[in-house]
Amino acid sequence: MLFDDQNPPDKRDLVEGKLVQLGMRVAELGSNVVFDFGFWGQDERSALRWIAHAVGARSQVVYLPIDHEEQRRRVTNRFATTPHRTFRMSDVELEQWRAQFQPPDEEELRGSQIPPVPPEHATWSEWASQRWPSLPDQYASTSS
């Protein structure tokens, strides 16, 4: 496991940024890429959809809803069976994280037009490089 039994938020964003950078490079080369590490907010998903389009790749948001009880059962089982590959999550943490999650709506799931970038950013690439500090703002020259 990368960070022992901890979940350091300052490191997670750096790792995710590198995964996004690598994945987009693979997509540029014409291979399929699946990102599966949360995307808790519409802005995260919109930025990645936009960047995928900028590199000439097709993107699709897939959402598999899960109720709290089943999620808690899976989290507990994962820690019990493979503690070296995960970290402990309390009920309070799990509830806080569930409350932060923004489920995709039907338009997002259909792949509708990507919403405008939040007003404090010039491009989705800029937004993404601030969200994931290790992701370079290399797509800024492409239209927003």
Language-model-detected regions and their locations in the chain:
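Acidic, metal-coordinating catalytic cores used for nucleic-acid/nucleotide bond scission
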Residues: 36-48
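A glycine- and Lys/Arg-enriched "phosphate-lid" helix/loop adjacent to the NTP-binding pocket
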Residues: 3-6, 54-103, 140
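Conserved substrate/cofactor phosphate-moiety recognition/catalytic segment
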Residues: 1-31, 77
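Aromatic/hydrophobic pocket-lining residues that form π-stacking "cages" and hydrophobic walls in ligand
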Residues: 22-23, 48-50
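Short glycine-/polar-rich loops that comprise or flank the Walker A/P-loop
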Residues: 29, 55-60, 106-112
